[in-house]
Amino acid sequence: MLEYGFKDDSLSLHTDLYQINMAETYWRDGIHEKKAIFELFFRRLPFENGYAVFAGLEKAIEYLENFKFTDSDLSYLQDELGYHEDFIEYLRGLSFTGSLYSMKEGELVFNNEPIMRVEAPLVEAQLIETALLNIVNYQTLIATKAARIKGVIGDEVALEFGTRRAHEMDAAMWGARAALIGGFSATSNVRAGKRFNIPVSGTHAHALVQAYRDEYTAFKKYAETHKDCVFLVDTYDTLRSGMPNAIRVAKEFGDRINFIGIRLDSGDLAYLSKKARKMLDEAGFTDAKVIASSDLDEHTIMNLKAQGARIDVWGVGTKLITAYDQPALGAVYKLVAIEEDGKMVDTIKISSNPEKVTTPGRKKVYRIINQSNHHSEGDYIALYDEQVNDQKRLRMFHPVHTFISKFVTNFYAKDLHELIFEKGILCYQNPEISDIQQYVQDNLSLLWEEYKRISKPEEYPVDLSEDCWSNKMQRIHEVKSRIEEELEEE
């Protein structure tokens, strides 16, 4: 493996083999430079949630900026996988020269609407599919899970503690960033803190107490070396040993330390948090926080709150960073138009499963916002050249059950797509994480509460324009007619 300098010197091979096989087919057939349009979207909202939070654009930008096959990549493709030298030489000069339109990170996204649109030579658009899906599928999933948890926690602090349970190192780092986009305040991952300039937070492990054998000594030694102190109190006996020793050390050190609080990592968190709060208050530490961890997620936190738990800070790890209850988003990347004789021709994929029938053509996504109450009426997918006139009433109808419709007036239409790359040139600046966090909250304020319920939310409208819907029906008819003609000829 090291023969090819395998040190992750590029991400261009972060793809499925069939992408390279298709690229060679396009190239040898001379259609590789045809302009193609692909769209990235998902079919079902994760966690049975009412919305998803888009994350992954920064990583996608980094990937596309550096999309280039290295010498070691090409040596591997030729020597080990058997690609011919002429194709290898073509790949040597390849980079991303297309355009990317995308929703911004922190945008609320919904099923069957294009999150990203790639307009590029066919071979380039094909080769980047796997990586873009890999990036968006994971990070959007984690940001959405984080937003669900934060929605339950409210104004209390949420900390990302999942690094050791993440699926690997980069997943931990980018997952930490996605968690902050979803509303978390800090991460335990120091690498993520350095890489993204985000807050880091941490306490100590049970090993510290075990190493010193008793809690008093362990807490005292920790206080001697750290100004900010959170003591983990459940190594032996939370109420009879951990809490009394934490309070003892906090009193002994006084103003020499910043006694932030205590952490509970096991046991009956509702009962223990109430007892710990009482002990802290009686000792005069009314500002000290009760921090809880231990396989938390939005459902557990809701139950703890229902039981009156006195928890101020929530450390969430495994069930966030692994998207424990739904470990895959299922986003797809589909060809919607391709160049034929100098003109763009819409393409469609048809399936016996209605939800897998794609919507053809180059499209835009608008958020239709009521100007009176500042709430969203739904998202409106239109063909690229259509004009959404906010001076006229707009008909919105369900794309499958078309009898479900409404007319909207007094609205403004927000175009959700931003130009990120134009002909291979980056023309977008990534915002700060704090700005993305605020953008999420601003977007959530547009939704009615019914769409934000943790359990059984109302379905948010994602509608097609009449032209977009008619175009889809026409393409379905054309494909079916062509198949019938071919069968008759046989």
Swiss-Prot record:
Record-listed Phosphohistidine modification sites: 206
**Any idea of its EC number?**
6.3.4.21
UniProt keyword annotations, A-Z: Ligase, Phosphoprotein, Pyridine nucleotide biosynthesis, Transferase
Superkingdom is Bacteria
Cite the post-translational modification comment: Transiently phosphorylated on a His residue during the reaction cycle. Phosphorylation strongly increases the affinity for substrates and increases the rate of nicotinate D-ribonucleotide production. Dephosphorylation regenerates the low-affinity form of the enzyme, leading to product release.
Q: What metabolic or biological pathway is this protein involved in?
A: Cofactor biosynthesis; NAD(+) biosynthesis; nicotinate D-ribonucleotide from nicotinate: step 1/1
Q: In the record, what terms sit under GO molecular function?
A: nicotinate phosphoribosyltransferase activity; transferase activity
Enzyme class of the recorded protein, top EC level: ligase
Q: Which InterPro entries match?
A: Aldolase_TIM (IPR013785), N/Namide_PRibTrfase (IPR041525), NAPRTase_C (IPR041619), NAPRTase_N (IPR040727), Nic_PRibTrfase-Fam (IPR007229), Nic_PRibTrfase_pncB (IPR006405), Nicotinate_pribotase-like_C (IPR036068)
Q: Is the keyword Phosphoprotein assigned to this protein?
A: yes
In the record, the note on similarity to other proteins reads: Belongs to the NAPRTase family.
Record's function text: Catalyzes the synthesis of beta-nicotinate D-ribonucleotide from nicotinate and 5-phospho-D-ribose 1-phosphate at the expense of ATP.
This chain belongs to the protein called Nicotinate phosphoribosyltransferase
Its lineage reads: Bacteria, Bacillati, Bacillota, Bacilli, Bacillales
